[in-house]
UniProtKB/Swiss-Prot annotation:
This is Large ribosomal subunit protein bL32. It comes from Exiguobacterium sp. (strain ATCC BAA-1283 / AT1b). GO terms for biological process: translation. The gene is rpmF. Keywords: Ribonucleoprotein, Ribosomal protein. GO terms for cellular component: large ribosomal subunit. One of its GO terms (molecular function) is structural constituent of ribosome. It comes from the Bacteria. Belongs to the bacterial ribosomal protein bL32 family. Pfam families: Ribosomal_L32p.
Amino acid sequence: MAVPFRRTSKTRKRLRRTHFKLNVPGMNECPNCGEMKLSHRVCKSCGHYNGKEVTSK
């Protein structure tokens, strides 16, 4: 069975883990009410999407 030849150093381990991070969601300002909303989704506060009212609040 294969075993590691050398112990992985703290630096190598941390450099490898720099890519294991969460991304910030893309937030935009709603053109209708000005609240922050996720891109390509209906605004939670006013119910508008793409300039049209999709849901009634």
